[in-house]
């Protein structure tokens, strides 16, 4: 089971890299800061796990529940939960002292990536979403 999950996470990460490359045709991608390999590896694993817990495992169901209580149909609540959690996921990358300077390219890509991970979470579950997020971060940050 774990080997299958690992392969699937790698597959989804490669798909998201392809989306990033496609978007890169329209906007140049800023280069990241140089750090040690091990510290970047740990940071990428941690970011994938932490962000998926916060934005998909906790926020998405909370948004869907709240919207359903306000009268939204289950389908509409799910769609708006994906949209809202993706928007907040993107915004969160620009907040605080370690936040990035706002850039339309990275904002758009992070919003799309948030939607990508949200759909993965809804269809395949937390493990695949978190693993794919960590694998994507490692692919673009270490390779």
PLM-predicted stretches and their roles:
Residues 1-48, 64-72:
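Juxtamembrane helix-loop-helix connectors linking adjacent transmembrane helices
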Residues 37-143:
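Transmembrane helix-loop-helix hairpins at the membrane interface
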């Amino acid at each position: 089971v774990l080997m299958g999950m690992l392969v699937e996470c790698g597959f989804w990460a490669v798909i998201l890299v392809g989306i990033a490359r496609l978007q890169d045709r329209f906007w140049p991608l800023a280069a990241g800061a140089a750090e040690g390999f091990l510290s970047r590896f740990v940071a990428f694993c941690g970011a994938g796990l932490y962000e998926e817990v916060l934005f998909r495992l906790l926020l998405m169901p909370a948004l869907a529940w709240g919207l359903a209580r306000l009268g939204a149909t289950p389908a509409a609540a799910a769609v708006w939960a994906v949209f809202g959690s993706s928007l907040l996921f993107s915004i969160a990358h620009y907040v605080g002292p370690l936040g990035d300077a706002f850039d339309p390219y990275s904002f758009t890509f992070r919003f799309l990536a948030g939607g990508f991970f949200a759909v993965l979470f809804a269809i395949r579950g937390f493990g695949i979403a978190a693993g794919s997020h960590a694998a994507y971060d490692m692919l673009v940050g270490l390779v």
